[in-house]
Amino acid sequence: MPKLVFSRHGLSEWNALNQFTGWADVDLAPEGVEEAKEGGRKIKEAGIEFDVAYTSVLTRAIKTCNYLLEYSDQLWVPQIKSWRLNERHYGKLQGLNKKETAEKYGDEQVHIWRRSYDTLPPLMEATDEGSAANDRRYAMLDQRDIPGGENLKVTLERALPFWQDEIAPALKDNKTVLVAAHGNSLRALAKHIEGISDEDIMDLEIPTGKPLVYELNDDLTVKEKYYL
């Protein structure tokens, strides 16, 4: 029976400061390191043995993946990194304090930017400070594929090819798979896996550093879902 484990990265430095993060390459906060280590211990206690691990190209997710594997005594497991598992790009909101942004634009508007399935944030230009267009880790991409901002719909469209080409085939081979990524890239994949509606996905929250286990049927429909 295929088994899939999602883990959002541990609390990041900008999570702790209540700032929009997106594609900004922010490190784990000390609390986030401990969350990731504890997640690894819970995986070990549950007896889950991975065949392959997938993560993004952002530091907070990569380190979380490493801690999860290290503290479950599986650091040798192959890891595959992809930009397609990156966090949702928050455009010009990246780096802004969420509370201050709500005071400026209103709680309702910020809630829509954060949780709506198909509303885009204010878009970042390629020439803006912090744009991924000049980041070496994305040098292999067509510039048109580098977003200036994303909603959850676009995040899913970006992540879905990686699911179809890499993750789903591994699961269909009956492998046990770890995906250590981000709140919104995991929400997007959860929407696809669970068939969550555009409306209901607004209410789905995935906590930091807490492994989410999917026990799947052979056709990759969900048999059981639970947190460790």
Curated annotation (Swiss-Prot):
It catalyses: (2R)-2-phosphoglycerate = (2R)-3-phosphoglycerate. It holds the Pfam family His_Phos_1. Substrate binds at residues 8-15, 21-22, 60, 87-90, 98, 114-115, 183-184. The record marks 182 as: Transition state stabilizer. GO terms for molecular function: phosphoglycerate mutase activity. It comes from the Bacteria. Gene3D superfamilies: Phosphoglycerate mutase-like. The active site is at residues 9, 87. Catalyzes the interconversion of 2-phosphoglycerate and 3-phosphoglycerate. This is 2,3-bisphosphoglycerate-dependent phosphoglycerate mutase. It comes from Enterococcus faecalis (strain ATCC 700802 / V583).
